[in-house]
Amino acid sequence: LPHLIKSIKAQGYHTAFYYGGEIDFANFRAYFNQGGADKIISKLDFDFSSSNTKWGIHDDIVFDTLFNDLNKETTPFFYTLFTLSSHEPFDIPIEPIFGSENNENSFKSAMHYTDACLGKFIEQAKKTTWWDSTLVVITADHGTTQINNTSNGQKETFHIPLIWLGGALAITDTIISSVSCQLDLAPTLL
C-alpha cells in the first residue's frame, strides 16, 4: 500500500516520529512501523520522572529532544512531532495563563503553552544550518468543541490550521483560503 513515510524514505530522507505519549495510542506504532520509520520516539524513551501528566511527557521536553536530534542529523530528514499537552485534561507544567476554572479556559491555556513550545522550537531552528533547506508543516489532528460551546456536528469543530513555513519556502506570506483536508497533505508534500 502507498505510505507517505515509504515515499519520503525512497527519496533518501531519514524519517522519525516523536510523541510524548503511549506509542500504541491511535495505532501510531503500527502506522510508523508499516512505513518503515527509521526512529520512533515515545514516552518510553524519556526518563520516567519526566512523565508527569496523564498523557505522558510534556511538549517542551519532546520539542527539546527533537531539536537536539535534528542538530545531529547529517542527511535529509522528515521528522514528525505529535503534541499532547493541548489535549484533555489540559495538564500543563506552567501557570494557566487563561485560568483553569472551565474547559474553555483550560484549553486556551494549554494551547498557549503548546504554542510557546512550538515558537521556541521555530526560533531555535531559524538559527541552525539546516533551517534554510527545511520545510515545517503545522496542522492538527482534529478541531475542538471547547471554544464557543460548539458541538461535533458544527462545521467550526472541523476547522484546523495548516501552516507552511521554513527556509525552504520560495513563497511566503501567502494565505490560501480554499477548503482542503488532511488527505491533501501527502500528495502536496510529494
Residue ranges and their predicted role:
Residues 1-190:
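Solvent-exposed soluble domains appended to multi-pass membrane proteins
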